[in-house]
Regions:
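N-terminal nicking endonuclease/strand-transfer module with a His-rich metal-binding environment
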Residues: 1-179
Length: 179
């Protein structure tokens, strides 16, 4: 099977000079204007975007499938200069599988672990190798705030600590509470 594996998670944050709209334009190979700062991000020349899609929880309005609408709404909803806008995953996919098999694999992961938990996920499958299927990977962008069935933003979820049978926080090896 795979001779190497990569799985990384990062936060798209204004405090780091990042933009959810720019990230969405990049992963999808699209041109999207950021209504927060007026900058247009054009990645239409990006090649080898094999598939792109937005997956929604069942009760979320269908307009959230529009990439520009979704990520501009995120940008406009978060007011702070250091706002956390999205979670970003980059996941290597097995080059031995076909594009359709990889699509099914990543969608199963997304639906089981993210959409089922109420997250909207914008994802794309890329292959940046010249030979084809040598560097196949998926980019996932997930919203940070839940949205209700009316399309209204909810509060960001707080950390939930793992407690022992006495209700005390369980500490990890660094002495910090486990979440």
């Amino acid at each position: 099977m795979a001779d190497s594996f990569h799985f990384s998670i990062d936060i798209i944050s204004r405090g780091k000079g990042k933009s959810a709209v720019a990230s969405a334009a990049y992963i999808s190979g699209e041109k999207i204007k950021n209504e927060w700062d007026g900058i247009t991000h054009d990645y239409t020349r990006k090649e080898r975007v094999l598939h792109k899609e937005i997956l929604l929880p069942k009760n979320i309005p269908k307009e959230f499938k529009d990439r520009s609408y979704l990520w501009n709404l995120v940008e406009l909803n978060e007011k702070a200069s250091n706002s956390q806008l999205a979670r970003q995953f980059i996941i290597a996919l097995p080059k031995e599988l076909s594009i359709e098999e990889n699509k099914k694999l990543i969608e199963d992961f997304i639906n089981t672990n993210l959409v089922k938990e109420g997250m909207i996920v914008d994802y794309a499958i890329h292959d940046e190798s010249q030979k084809g299927n040598e560097n196949i990977h998926a980019h996932l962008l997930c919203i940070m705030r839940p949205i209700n069935e009316k399309g209204e933003w909810q509060a960001k979820s707080k950390k939930e600590y793992i407690l022992d049978e006495k209700g005390e926080k369980i500490l990890n090896k660094n002495g910090k509470p486990k979440t």
